[in-house]
Amino acid sequence: RTCYKTYSDKSKTCPRGEDICYTKTWCDGFCSQRGKRVELGCAATCPKVKTGVEIKCCSTDYCNPFPVWNPR
């Protein structure tokens, strides 16, 4: 599996057994100015997240691009 790892669309071949790509987003103290924090990566299973954290998991190559931010 090949997943995006950074906002600049750098992709990475995932380690063996990590066949899920994910995009995790959440707000911090600068959310209103900078938008949500974003983490992209690979995992063996879709990661569990805390309240206030959104996650999208997918299982095809390049399926987790950096999300588009729409300023308010």
From Swiss-Prot:
Pfam families given in the database record: Toxin_cobra-type
Expressing tissues: Expressed by the venom gland.
Annotated Gene Ontology cellular component terms: extracellular region
Gene3D superfamilies, sorted: CD59 (2.10.60.10)
Matching CDD domains: TFP_snake_toxin
Keyword annotations of the record: Acetylcholine receptor inhibiting toxin, Disulfide bond, Ion channel impairing toxin, Neurotoxin, Postsynaptic neurotoxin, Secreted, Toxin
InterPro entries in the record: Snake_3FTx, Snake_toxin-like_sf, Snake_toxin_con_site, Toxin_cobra-type
Listed SUPFAM superfamilies: Snake toxin-like
Localization (cell): Secreted
Disulfide bond sites: C3-C21, C14-C42, C27-C31, C46-C57, C58-C63
Molecular function terms from GO: acetylcholine receptor inhibitor activity; ion channel regulator activity; toxin activity
Family: Belongs to the three-finger toxin family. Long-chain subfamily. Type II alpha-neurotoxin sub-subfamily.
Function as written in the Swiss-Prot or TrEMBL entry: Binds with high affinity to muscular (alpha-1/CHRNA1) and neuronal (alpha-7/CHRNA7) nicotinic acetylcholine receptor (nAChR) and inhibits acetylcholine from binding to the receptor, thereby impairing neuromuscular and neuronal transmission.
This protein's name: Alpha-elapitoxin-Djk2a
Native organism: Dendroaspis jamesoni kaimosae
Taxon lineage: Eukaryota, Metazoa, Chordata, Craniata, Vertebrata
